[in-house]
């Protein structure tokens, strides 16, 4: 008796269930922050709303640039343009830009954000500078 009831319950579980996926909701963010992290090897552009929630991001590596090409100004420009277009789809019109790092893609990424139709209001350099903190790595001898 108990076995028959158990097999009937198991038969009900095997039936197909329809999974309904909710479409990702587009946020309407008129103003945001662009964080540009430019290292010697790569450039990462992240666009967020004022509270820090990420709206869009792109990096030179995610666009298919590999090796030493990731650190070029052109790769940074492409990453910034793509991230800006994604942010404009969310209704973003103006940006405050925060640039960090010593990379060669700093300037071109900021120019690309402005060229993509976003109003750049403030450009702030937030590169971390140590007050004689950690000992730097030894010099390269090539």
UniProtKB/Swiss-Prot annotation:
GO cellular component, one term: ribosome
InterPro entries assigned to the protein according to its UniProt record, in alphabetical order: Ribosomal_uS11 (IPR001971), Ribosomal_uS11_bac-type (IPR019981), Ribosomal_uS11_CS (IPR018102), Ribosomal_uS11_sf (IPR036967)
Gene Ontology annotations of biological process type: translation
Lineage: superkingdom: Bacteria
Gene3D superfamilies reported for this sequence: Ribosomal protein S11 (3.30.420.80)
Region (Disordered): 1-29
Compositionally biased region (Low complexity): 1-10
GO molecular function, one term: rRNA binding
Compositionally biased residues, Basic residues: 16-29
Swiss-Prot/TrEMBL keywords: Ribonucleoprotein, Ribosomal protein, RNA-binding, rRNA-binding
Family, per entry: Belongs to the universal ribosomal protein uS11 family.
Family matches, as HAMAP family: Ribosomal_uS11
Subunit structure comment from the entry: Part of the 30S ribosomal subunit. Interacts with proteins S7 and S18. Binds to IF-3.
Cited function: Located on the platform of the 30S subunit, it bridges several disparate RNA helices of the 16S rRNA. Forms part of the Shine-Dalgarno cleft in the 70S ribosome.
PANTHER family: 40S RIBOSOMAL PROTEIN S14/30S RIBOSOMAL PROTEIN S11 (PTHR11759)
Protein name: Small ribosomal subunit protein uS11
